[in-house]
């Protein structure tokens, strides 16, 4: 069973409307969890607060700094994928001589999905994310305005703006907040143009961009799991012949159709019933493999794509200039530049899943796991908390906190990924997953040394 909440939707033309939604501020998306929490990076954000260490701020601790790193909200397929999905549906309808079992709906299904932009549900996700950030960190948000950056993709910028809408909505309702301050706004847009230095987006490491390891591993696993599914679908759809990739496209449609059909994603797409429970576990692992070997530790240059952001994070946490020769923009990050202050208490950055995965691995958050095997499922609970659905769902968010506790002489650092405390690696971690700031910074030597940027074949700008 699941609960469907009512909330105010984004104002359009000055009119706010009520929306039935499966997304809540605290819990994220909790409808159809046996399926929706296994859609890899296409899963809508769901809270992992109850999967590990306590996520509350410990007693006798006072927060002094928070950085949020967020993925955009749920979107329509990319333009290239949307074209493939539509062509597949048309081919099925042109060739099927019958529609048996769960495939009956395909006879009359009309593909109407857009491309690239946020869905209405994705918009609501980001408003909720802003509300949650304000409320979770009210001790700071009442009196401090976050410094906000966004990669300049339209859906990422829109996500940042909607986050701000939720944030300011909560602040306006908080009687204890300082209402004399300026409203939060996106302070810096960072170009995603090819070759532009951008710590929130990979595109400047030539050797990495040319690498196809993630695609190769995904293709190998797809060839393992898709044929039995295709055999069943061919029985249900006589006259139709599906490739392995097309089987996966039909699985993709389950998630995309669900987050697009209703504003609150309250209706499960009929595409979902085409596949079994076991097959959804396989699909989830397929997506995890793709991210791990495409952008994470499975790729020799994956974590290197995240070191620029880590070096910016160090600068923010230590109130010092950025020391980086990889993806940072030296003009934007110049010492004393208004575009990169290091004296703020709150920071927010908005990007894509493929921008976040390298950052998480550059932080070493999943270093407690062996490399993911290509031929069997290793769930997140056995992979140091890593899976695509647990790490980078739609509207994913990482919180990096500093807190002053009791008689400690320096602040402690803690990282939460979708509300799950990710115990830090490489430093003297305590029972709550935290390290002292100096120890945390020292543990980030991979980033401070530039990772393996020398293997990229380019020089930073």
Swiss-Prot record:
Its main location: secreted. The keyword Secreted applies. Pfam families: His_Phos_2. It is found in: Secreted. The active site is at 72 (nucleophile). It comes from the Eukaryota. This is Phytase A. It comes from Penicillium oxalicum.
């Amino acid at each position: 069973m699941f609960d469907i909440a009512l909330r105010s939707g984004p104002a359009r033309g000055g009119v706010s409307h009520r929306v039935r939604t499966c997304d809540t501020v605290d819990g994220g998306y909790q409808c159809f969890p046996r399926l929706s929490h296994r859609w890899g990076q296409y899963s809508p954000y769901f809270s992992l607060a109850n999967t590990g260490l306590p996520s509350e701020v410990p007693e006798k601790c006072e927060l002094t700094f928070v950085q949020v790193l967020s993925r955009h909200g749920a979107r329509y397929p990319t333009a290239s994928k949307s074209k493939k999905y539509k062509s597949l549906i048309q081919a099925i309808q042109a060739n099927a001589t019958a529609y048996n079992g769960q495939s009956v709906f395909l006879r009359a299904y009309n593909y109407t999905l857009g491309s690239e932009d946020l869905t209405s549900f994705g918009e609501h996700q980001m408003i909720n994310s802003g509300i949650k950030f304000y409320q979770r960190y009210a001790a700071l948000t009442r009196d401090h305005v976050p410094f906000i950056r966004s990669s300049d993709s339209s859906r990422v910028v829109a996500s940042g703006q909607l986050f701000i809408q939720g944030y300011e909505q909560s602040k306006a309702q908080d009687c204890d907040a300082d209402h004399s301050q300026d409203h939060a706004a996106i302070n810096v847009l960072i170009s995603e143009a090819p070759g532009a230095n951008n710590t929130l987006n990979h595109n400047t490491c030539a050797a990495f961009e040319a690498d196809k390891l993630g695609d190769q591993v995904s293709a190998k696993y797809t060839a393992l799991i898709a044929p039995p599914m295709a055999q069943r679908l061919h029985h249900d759809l006589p006259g139709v012949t599906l490739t392995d990739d097309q089987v996966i496209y039909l699985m993709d449609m389950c998630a995309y159709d669900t987050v697009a059909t209703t504003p609150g994603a309250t209706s499960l797409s009929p595409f979902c019933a085409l596949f079994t429970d076991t097959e959804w576990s396989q699909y989830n692992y397929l997506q995890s493999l793709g991210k791990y070997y495409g952008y994470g530790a499975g790729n020799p240059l994956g974590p290197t794509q995240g070191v620029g952001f880590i070096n910016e994070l160090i600068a923010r946490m230590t109130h010092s200039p950025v020391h980086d020769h990889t993806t940072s923009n030296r003009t934007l990050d110049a010492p004393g530049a208004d575009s990169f202050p290091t004296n703020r208490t709150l920071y927010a950055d908005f990007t894509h899943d493929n921008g976040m995965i390298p950052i998480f691995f550059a932080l070493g958050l999943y270093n407690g796991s062996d490399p993911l095997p290509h031929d069997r499922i290793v769930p997140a609970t056995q992979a140091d908390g890593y899976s695509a659905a647990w790490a980078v769902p739609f509207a994913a968010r990482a919180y990096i906190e500093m807190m002053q506790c009791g008689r400690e002489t320096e602040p402690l650092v803690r990282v939460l990924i979708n509300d799950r405390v990710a115990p830090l690696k490489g430093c003297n971690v305590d029972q709550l997953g935290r390290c002292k700031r100096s120890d945390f910074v020292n543990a980030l030597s991979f980033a401070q040394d530039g990772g393996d940027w020398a293997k990229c074949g380019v020089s930073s700008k």
